């Protein structure tokens, strides 16, 4: 699925399955600036990338297919068609799907019935797990049923909060940077 990222006057779209995955646009001129990062398995290519940080200094892109985190200088990424990463790190344990930034750590969703998230340090080494699945009164789940019933996606504010949105239930969990549940929000459709 296509994704859109914005910082200042630059808009980036991530276009899966195109030869060049990222298309850059100027919001001022409303014109395309260029295309970046080839689809593929070469050293500077990616397969399933998502931008997890985009500011005036740097762009962090995680390729979920190779568990690799790429760091780019924002100015170089925008102005240089053949931009190369300043740094490339492989995440130690395979996170399942999404990766987010939380303070100085990376957070990855897991396919684990005990904890929803893995926390990684700056070097991609696992430093902990956290996140508890909701408990439903009068229901007990097998591990596989629990993983399916509480499928979720998450977003971070990059500093100290994670919002977990469940796909099949009207529920949002908010965690802090230490993995403590701060708030559980039930919507009108919650059952």
PLM feature segments, named:
Residues 1, 41-48, 90-93, 136-148, ...:
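Short glycine-/Asp-/Thr-/Trp-enriched loop segments that recur within the blades
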Residues 1-21:
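Beta-strand-rich domains and repeat architectures in extracellular enzymes and scaffolds
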Residues 2-6, 50-54, 97-102, 145-159:
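Structural signature of eukaryotic scaffold interfaces centered on beta-propeller domains
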Residues 13-17, 61-66, 108-112, 164-167:
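Conserved beta-strand positions in repeat-built beta-propeller and related beta-rich domains
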Residues 27-29, 73-77, 121-125, 176-180:
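Short loop/turn segments that connect beta-strands within beta-propeller blades
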Residues 31-65, 85-90:
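Blade-loop segments of beta-propeller domains
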Residues 32-40, 79-91, 127-135, 181-191:
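Beta-propeller fold detector
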Residues 66-67, 73-105, 109:
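Asp-box/WD-like beta-propeller blade repeats and closely related beta-sheet repeat scaffolds
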